[in-house]
């Protein structure tokens, strides 16, 4: 049957896509409402989409499903995730959780409830709500929140912590990340033996 006045077929729902509602990706057309990650169903756009053959994914799910696997292949230095990848068909074995200590009081909750503020780890002074920035699970002053090595201003998206200090991702990777061939951290020349 001819397709009179219609558009291409949607790569997700296989219904006709008209020009006003069309998003093109990898040579295929999609409705704006059908342009979602095939694994986590997150809405996509041109900056967040990653295509694999006829499938579309967000960059995170694409990396988990088709990216390199193993130690040293993560989302960057200091990034941890609790996602097991089950929605991608990946298997995960979790080690048993250690027993929790039986404590009944939390001094930081007590302090916050009765007006005493928490202390900044860098300067030791009180941190009030108007100047509070969270990093490494602790409150910091905005002025006490630069990278400990390069002094670059940090945000929640580029901060990593180690031993109570804050670092930008670049300094963290250079100083605490994996080293050797393939990691960009080769510190000495390898001699060729004949």
Curated annotation (Swiss-Prot):
Q: Does the keyword Repeat apply?
A: yes
Show the segment(s) annotated as Interaction with TCAP: 1-5
Q: Report where it is expressed, by tissue.
A: High in striated muscle and adult heart.
Please provide, alphabetically and separated by semicolons, the GO molecular function terms listed in this UniProt record.
actin binding; actinin binding; identical protein binding; metal ion binding; MRF binding; RNA polymerase II-specific DNA-binding transcription factor binding; structural constituent of muscle; telethonin binding
Q: What are the protein's UniProt keywords?
A: Actin-binding, Cytoplasm, Cytoskeleton, Developmental protein, Differentiation, LIM domain, Metal-binding, Myogenesis, Nucleus, Phosphoprotein, Repeat, Transcription, Transcription regulation, Zinc
Query: Which superkingdom?
Result: Eukaryota
Instruction: Give GO cellular component annotations, separated by semicolons.
Output: cytoplasm; cytoskeleton; nucleus; Z disc
Q: How is it modified after translation?
A: Phosphorylated by PKC/PRKCA.
Phosphoserine (modified residue): where? Answer: 95, 111, 153
Main subcellular location of this protein, as a coarse class: nucleus
Pfam families, alphabetically? LIM
Residue window of motif Nuclear localization signal: 64-69
Secretion signal span: none
Instruction: Report domain LIM zinc-binding positions.
Output: 10-61, 120-171
Keyword hit for Oxidoreductase: no
Family annotation (SUPFAM superfamilies): Glucocorticoid receptor-like (DNA-binding domain)
Q: Where is this region: Interaction with CLF2?
A: 94-105
The record's section on SMART domains has: LIM (SM00132)
Q: Which GO terms describe its biological process?
A: blood vessel remodeling; cardiac muscle contraction; cardiac muscle hypertrophy; cardiac muscle tissue development; cardiac myofibril assembly; detection of muscle stretch; glucose homeostasis; heart development
Q: Where in the cell is it found?
A: Nucleus; Cytoplasm; Cytoplasm, Cytoskeleton; Cytoplasm, Myofibril, Sarcomere, Z line
Q: What does the subunit comment say?
A: Self-associates. Oligomeric in the cytoplasm and monomeric in the nucleus. Homooligomers preferentially form along the actin cytoskeleton. Interacts with TCAP, ACTN2 and NRAP. Interacts with LDHD, SPTB, MYOD1, MYOG, MYF6. Interacts with GLRX3 (via C-terminus); GLRX3 and calcineurin compete for interaction with CSRP3. Interacts with CFL2; the stoichiometry influences F-actin depolymerization and possibly two molecules of CFL2 can interact with one molecule of CSRP3 resulting in the highest functional impact; the interaction is stronger with phosphorylated CFL2.
Function summary = Positive regulator of myogenesis. Acts as a cofactor for myogenic bHLH transcription factors such as MYOD1, and probably MYOG and MYF6. Enhances the DNA-binding activity of the MYOD1:TCF3 isoform E47 complex and may promote formation of a functional MYOD1:TCF3 isoform E47:MEF2A complex involved in myogenesis. Plays a crucial and specific role in the organization of cytosolic structures in cardiomyocytes. Could play a role in mechanical stretch sensing. May be a scaffold protein that promotes the assembly of interacting proteins at Z-line structures.
Show the domain comment.
LIM zinc-binding domain 1 is required for self-association. LIM zinc-binding domain 1 and LIM zinc-binding domain 2 both are required for optimal actin-bundling activity. LIM zinc-binding domain 1 mediates binding to MYOD1. LIM zinc-binding domain 2 mediates binding to SPTB.
Name of the featured protein: Cysteine and glycine-rich protein 3
- State the taxonomy lineage: Eukaryota, Metazoa, Chordata, Craniata, Vertebrata
């Amino acid at each position: 049957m001819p397709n009179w006045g219609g558009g291409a077929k949607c790569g997700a729902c296989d219904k006709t896509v008209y020009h006003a509602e069309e998003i093109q990706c990898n040579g295929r057309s999609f409705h704006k409402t059908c342009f979602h990650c095939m694994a986590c169903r997150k809405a996509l756009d041109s900056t967040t989409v990653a295509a694999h053959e006829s499938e579309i994914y967000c960059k995170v799910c694409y990396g988990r499903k088709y990216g390199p696997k193993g130690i040293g292949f993560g989302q960057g230095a200091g990034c941890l995730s609790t996602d097991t990848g089950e929605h991608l068909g990946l298997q995960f074995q979790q080690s048993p959780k250690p027993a929790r200590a039986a404590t009944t009081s939390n001094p930081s909750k007590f302090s916050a409830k009765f007006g005493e503020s928490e202390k900044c780890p860098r300067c030791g002074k009180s941190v009030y709500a108007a100047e509070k920035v969270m990093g490494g699970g602790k409150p910091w002053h905005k002025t006490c929140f630069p990278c400990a090595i390069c002094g670059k201003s940090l945000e929640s998206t580029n901060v990593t912590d180690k031993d109570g200090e804050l670092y930008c991702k670049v300094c963290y990777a250079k100083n605490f990340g994996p080293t050797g061939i393939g990691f960009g951290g080769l510190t000495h020349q390898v001699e060729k033996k004949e």
